[in-house]
Amino acid sequence: MMLEDFKIQWFPGHMTKAKRMMESQIKLVDVVVEMLDARIPRSSTNPMLQDILGSKPKVIALNKIDMADKAQTDVWLEKIKHSGLPVCKIDCATGKGVKQLISAVQLAAKPVIDKWLKKGVRNRPVRVMIVGIPNVGKSTLINRLVGKNKVMAADKPGVTRGQQWVTIAKGLELLDTPGVLWPKFDDPSVGFALAVTGAIKEDVFDREQAVELLLDLLIRKYPQDLLNKYAVSLEQGDDVNAVMAKIAVARGCLKSGGQLDIDKVVQLVLRDFRAGRLGRFTIDEP
């Protein structure tokens, strides 16, 4: 399968509502934190956000760094810095980099705070809106900052509840927003990246096609990690179908009679990739 053939169009009604809520709340916000997936920094950048956010100070939080290729992450960091935006690499699951993110937000808010002080306004919390695609880790970040599970999160795209302000002890008031996608992915590589990382519900794309493309990418860029995980050998001339067959045999993904159960292989590879069990991979090239 060619990447150009991978098509997705997904814009649930609740995302339209979330976008409208975000537009109405932006007037109350002092700083915006846009969370990106470090494995797909380009694909997880929502092109609609700039129109919504306007000139608000923005900090980029590159999340899930422990699942991404370290060398590629460093290149992405420099690229984002070169664009003029402050950026922090974080891992919300472990708390890595979260303190640095708080410092970056406070620094971005300093011009706003200085204006308040000139007007005699004191002790007002800095209001921060956290934005990003589904499953990028917004609620996990707030849970980490608050220190308790005040924001319910689920490992499914588009299920975080309505917007809510959460006050934390660092003089920040955070707004968690439901993940918002855009209605059409003009670049099929973006749809593919969002699909395999779990930002899009699986019922709107062909999982087997997605895994074929993913395996093709891993064979080209990270063959040793892939082979080590599934204990298979890669012979010259092996294509994606051959590799899927080898994984099926190695992992017992077989139907009665010894037929390959490709659907089980697809589920296995997707699950392992999303959990970071295959290794540290970056899909988007800087």
Residue ranges and their predicted role:
Residues M1-V31, R39-M48, I52-K58, I65, ...:
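Helix-rich effector regions associated with P-loop NTPase G domains
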Residues E34:
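Redox-cofactor binding/interface segments in oxidoreductases and associated redox assembly factors
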Residues L49-D51, L77, V146:
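Short, solvent-exposed amphipathic alpha-helical segments in soluble enzyme
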Residues V59, D66-V131, K150, R251-L254:
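Canonical P-loop GTPase G-domain recognition
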Residues C92, I142, L172-L175:
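Conserved active-site beta-strand-loop modules that form the wall/rim of enzyme catalytic pockets
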Residues Q100, A104, T140, L213, ...:
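Alpha-helical scaffold segments in soluble metabolic enzymes
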Residues R127-G147, V151, T177:
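Glycine-rich phosphate-binding P-loop
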